[in-house]
Structure formats: structure tokens, C-alpha cells
């Protein structure tokens, strides 16, 4: 990791660190990292996704049961690069980053997630998040 990159990493316990959506996008665009979106297939379909991200759900819908194929999927997606993990608001991706680290990967959590925290009215997408920050995303 370059000195410039390390200044953008917030220390974390159990994984390589937390990074902003903009840092994750820069690393992904430069080929330095692979983005793994750990949201469910339903979330990707209904809410939107990041082009180029690899979908490896941490939990599965319905019921949000653990994905038994997570370990295999995240290792295959990494391709020898560091991984940046994205979820809805930056919570599931912490657990996924810890697991990826246990598997021997250099794993980072993307702060704020795809949608960010809910605002005072309970709506997401207005208080932080990949989408609100104007970074690349699509919706089917």
C-alpha cells in the first residue's frame, strides 16, 4: 500500500481498515482493489448496484441466513488484490471484512455503504453512502 493510500485508511479491529466511498472508487478504478458487494440479490435488484463490483452476498434473502458460499466466492473474487466490501450502510460489510481477513485477504470496509444511514424521516440515500456521494451506480 502506498503512503498516499494508507493516509485514507481508518484503523479497524479485525480487518485492514475502513475507507470512504471515494477511496474505494479510486482503488477500484486503478485496479488496486476488487469491490465485493455483500448485499442480498434482492437489494441489488431493487435498490441498485455498482458496475464492476462482484456480488457475493454475506447473508441470503429471505430470512437473512448466512451464505454458505461466501468464503469460496470472496476468495475467487479477490484475484490476489485487496478487497473493499460494500453493504447497505456499512454494518454487514464489517462482519464480511473480518471474515475475509480470516481467510487471508487484505479486506477493507467501505464506510456509509451504498445507501448510508437513514435521515430523520427514516429514508436512506440522503445521509452519506455511495449513491449519495455521486459515485457510479446503476439500477435495473
Go through each PLM region and give its residues.
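Rhodanese-like catalytic fold shared by cysteine-dependent sulfurtransferases
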Residues: 1-33, 41-82, 93-140
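Short, surface-exposed ligand- or partner-binding patches at beta-edge/loop junctions that are enriched
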Residues: 85-86
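Conserved G/P- and acidic residue-centered "switch" motifs that form tight phosphate/ATP-binding loops
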Residues: 37, 90
Amino acid at each position: 500500500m502506498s503512503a498516499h493510500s494508507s493516509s485514507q485508511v481508518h484503523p479497524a479491529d479485525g480487518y485492514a481498515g475502513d475507507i470512504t466511498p471515494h477511496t474505494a472508487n479510486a482503488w477500484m478504478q486503478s485496479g488496486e482493489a476488487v469491490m465485493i458487494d455483500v448485499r442480498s440479490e434482492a437489494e441489488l435488484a431493487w435498490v441498485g448496484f455498482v458496475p464492476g463490483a462482484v456480488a457475493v452476498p454475506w447473508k441470503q434473502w429471505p430470512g437473512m441466513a448466512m451464505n454458505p458460499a461466501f468464503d469460496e466466492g470472496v476468495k475467487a473474487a479477490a484475484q490476489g488484490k485487496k478487497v473493499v466490501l460494500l453493504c447497505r450502510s456499512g454494518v454487514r460489510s464489517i462482519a464480511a471484512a473480518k471474515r475475509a481477513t480470516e481467510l487471508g485477504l487484505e479486506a477493507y470496509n467501505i464506510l456509509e455503504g451504498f445507501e448510508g444511514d437513514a435521515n430523520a424521516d427514516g429514508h436512506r440515500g440522503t445521509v452519506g453512502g455511495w449513491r449519495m456521494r455521486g459515485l457510479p451506480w446503476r439500477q435495473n
